[in-house]
Amino acid sequence: MRLAFVTSNPGKVEEARKYFEPLGVEVYQLKVSYPEIQADTLEEVAEYGAKWLAQRVDGPFFLDDSGLFVEALKGFPGVYSAYVYKTIGYQGILKLLQGEKNRKAHFKSVIAYWDGELHIFTGRVDGKIATEPRGSGGFGFDPIFIPEGFDRTFAEMTTEEKNRISHRGRALREFANWLKENLK
């Protein structure tokens, strides 16, 4: 089975392949732009994108919408994480949190899979925002996010370490387990 991952990020595709290759599923990157609506939840954004793409893409595909939710910022950047990263970056988040004691945050990933029907899979990892960027691995907000139970940021971890505990890794695992059961 071939499965398209609709994303412009090749790093996400490599991460996904690790979960699906053992199932005999070939994941390939499909660079197609789709509208990302302004909505209250990642689930709404992912669902809209999948339904829009279903009218334009042949065969099964999935997409991922993820967000960083910072408690002291009332969940900001949340559903606006991609836009916020492009405009103010992680330095902007650090600036907004200057002097703030509450550094609690979580990452959430929502995967929307379309095979003629919509299937949603989610993953979440709790943690906190570092006081300064650390590490050179990963992408996005990885240099400032420290997952619960660790003293290193995602950017200081190997790809394998991060994937084992990350929000996207958890959502991909849930999706792969579902696919394994439903491909029979």
Swiss-Prot record:
<dbReference type="GO" id="GO:0017111">
    <property type="term" value="F:ribonucleoside triphosphate phosphatase activity"/>
</dbReference>
<dbReference type="GO" id="GO:0000166">
    <property type="term" value="F:nucleotide binding"/>
</dbReference>
<dbReference type="GO" id="GO:0047429">
    <property type="term" value="F:nucleoside triphosphate diphosphatase activity"/>
</dbReference>
<keyword id="KW-0378">Hydrolase</keyword>
<keyword id="KW-0479">Metal-binding</keyword>
<keyword id="KW-0547">Nucleotide-binding</keyword>
<keyword id="KW-0460">Magnesium</keyword>
<dbReference type="InterPro" id="IPR020922">
    <property type="entry name" value="dITP/XTP_pyrophosphatase"/>
</dbReference>
<feature type="binding site">
    <location>
        <position position="162"/>
    </location>
    <ligand>
        <name>substrate</name>
    </ligand>
</feature>
<dbReference type="GO" id="GO:0005737">
    <property type="term" value="C:cytoplasm"/>
</dbReference>
<comment type="similarity">
    <text>Belongs to the HAM1 NTPase family.</text>
</comment>
<keyword id="KW-0546">Nucleotide metabolism</keyword>
<feature type="binding site">
    <location>
        <position position="65"/>
    </location>
    <ligand>
        <name>Mg(2+)</name>
    </ligand>
</feature>
<comment type="function">
    <text>Pyrophosphatase that catalyzes the hydrolysis of nucleoside triphosphates to their monophosphate derivatives, with a high preference for the non-canonical purine nucleotides XTP (xanthosine triphosphate), dITP (deoxyinosine triphosphate) and ITP. Seems to function as a house-cleaning enzyme that removes non-canonical purine nucleotides from the nucleotide pool, thus preventing their incorporation into DNA/RNA and avoiding chromosomal lesions.</text>
</comment>
<dbReference type="GO" id="GO:0009117">
    <property type="term" value="P:nucleotide metabolic process"/>
</dbReference>
<feature type="binding site">
    <location>
        <position position="66"/>
    </location>
    <ligand>
        <name>substrate</name>
    </ligand>
</feature>
<feature type="active site" description="Proton acceptor">
    <location>
        <position position="65"/>
    </location>
</feature>
<dbReference type="InterPro" id="IPR002637">
    <property type="entry name" value="RdgB/HAM1"/>
</dbReference>
<comment type="subunit">
    <text>Homodimer.</text>
</comment>
<dbReference type="GO" id="GO:0036222">
    <property type="term" value="F:XTP diphosphatase activity"/>
</dbReference>
<feature type="binding site">
    <location>
        <begin position="139"/>
        <end position="142"/>
    </location>
    <ligand>
        <name>substrate</name>
    </ligand>
</feature>
<dbReference type="InterPro" id="IPR029001">
    <property type="entry name" value="ITPase-like_fam"/>
</dbReference>
<dbReference type="Pfam" id="PF01725">
    <property type="entry name" value="Ham1p_like"/>
</dbReference>
<dbReference type="GO" id="GO:0046872">
    <property type="term" value="F:metal ion binding"/>
</dbReference>
<dbReference type="GO" id="GO:0009146">
    <property type="term" value="P:purine nucleoside triphosphate catabolic process"/>
</dbReference>
<protein>
    <recommendedName>
        <fullName>dITP/XTP pyrophosphatase</fullName>
        <ecNumber>3.6.1.66</ecNumber>
    </recommendedName>
</protein>
<dbReference type="GO" id="GO:0036220">
    <property type="term" value="F:ITP diphosphatase activity"/>
</dbReference>
<feature type="binding site">
    <location>
        <position position="36"/>
    </location>
    <ligand>
        <name>Mg(2+)</name>
    </ligand>
</feature>
<dbReference type="GO" id="GO:0035870">
    <property type="term" value="F:dITP diphosphatase activity"/>
</dbReference>
<dbReference type="GO" id="GO:0009143">
    <property type="term" value="P:nucleoside triphosphate catabolic process"/>
</dbReference>
<feature type="binding site">
    <location>
        <begin position="167"/>
        <end position="168"/>
    </location>
    <ligand>
        <name>substrate</name>
    </ligand>
</feature>
<feature type="binding site">
    <location>
        <begin position="7"/>
        <end position="12"/>
    </location>
    <ligand>
        <name>substrate</name>
    </ligand>
</feature>
